[in-house]
């Protein structure tokens, strides 16, 4: 498989060959407005990761070249260490943000039809951001930040693959993509008197 096809198979939007020897960030199919794709092209081989969907680095190698596999393993291990360091830093920043939040109403919730619902609100630079903690197991690994107009973003470097936020009420488990969708599903199930744990997955890839 050629390099461009390999990258596209991982959901990375790329049209031309990148610079050799440096990490470059690219948009992804699932989040085209963000740069969740990471590539380091080395000529005979490359390291590729879609941070929104993958937790490990994938290695591409040219079909026509002799590859120093020991060097590839060392480089992959180094990339994995740096990735985990960035994820740990993001997790710590997420905790600091949540610690600064207050419970309150938010314009985004109002716009989605939930004027009486409260959430975590972070008052930052005269902007009220709705903060959604993102959990993997029992640990918060990041947050989704939602502006009053609905614009959303994650923290740089945070792990999003496998992360969820759950409205817990017991009963069945229901998956959905977005936070507002989760609120709607929760309200509908409550009206039907069907208890459920509604898991907000943040991306379609996390629902697979």
Regions found by a protein language model. Name each.
Residues 55-57, 115-116, 139:
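A short acidic, glycine/proline-enriched capping/turn motif at secondary-structure boundaries
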Residues 20, 122, 204:
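Residue-level "edge-of-site" marker
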Residues 36-40, 118-124:
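Short amphipathic beta-strand and strand-loop transition segments with alternating hydrophobic
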Residues 125-208:
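Phosphate-handling DNA/RNA-contact segment within nucleic-acid enzymes
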Residues 112:
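Mobile, glycine-rich extracellular loop/lid and propeptide segments
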Residues 105-108, 116-122, 141:
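Phosphate-handling catalytic cores of nucleic-acid transaction enzymes
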Residues 1-107:
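Non-catalytic accessory segments of DNA primases and related replication-initiation nucleases
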Residues 93-96, 121, 145:
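Catalytic cores of nucleic-acid editing and processing enzymes
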């Amino acid at each position: 498989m050629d390099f461009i096809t390999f990258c596209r198979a991982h959901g990375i939007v790329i049209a031309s060959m990148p610079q050799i020897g440096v990490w470059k960030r690219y948009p992804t199919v699932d989040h085209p407005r963000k740069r969740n794709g990471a590539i380091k092209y080395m000529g005979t081989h490359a390291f590729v990761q879609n941070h929104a969907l993958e937790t490990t680095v994938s290695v591409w190698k040219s079909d026509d070249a002799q590859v120093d596999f020991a060097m590839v393993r060392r480089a992959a291990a180094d990339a994995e260490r740096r990735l985990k360091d960035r994820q740990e830093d993001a997790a710590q920043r997420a905790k600091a943000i949540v610690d600064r939040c207050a419970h309150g109403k938010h314009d985004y919730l109002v716009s989605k039809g939930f004027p009486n619902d409260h959430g975590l609100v972070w008052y930052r630079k005269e902007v009220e951001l709705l903060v959604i903690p993102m959990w993997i197991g029992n640990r918060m690994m990041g947050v989704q930040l939602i502006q009053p107009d609905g614009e959303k973003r994650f923290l740089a470097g945070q792990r999003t693959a496998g992360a969820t936020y759950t409205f817990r009420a017991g009963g069945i488990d229901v998956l959905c993509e977005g936070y507002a969708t989760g609120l709607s599903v929760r309200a509908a199930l409550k009206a039907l008197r069907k208890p459920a744990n509604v898991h907000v997955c943040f991306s379609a890839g996390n629902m697979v």
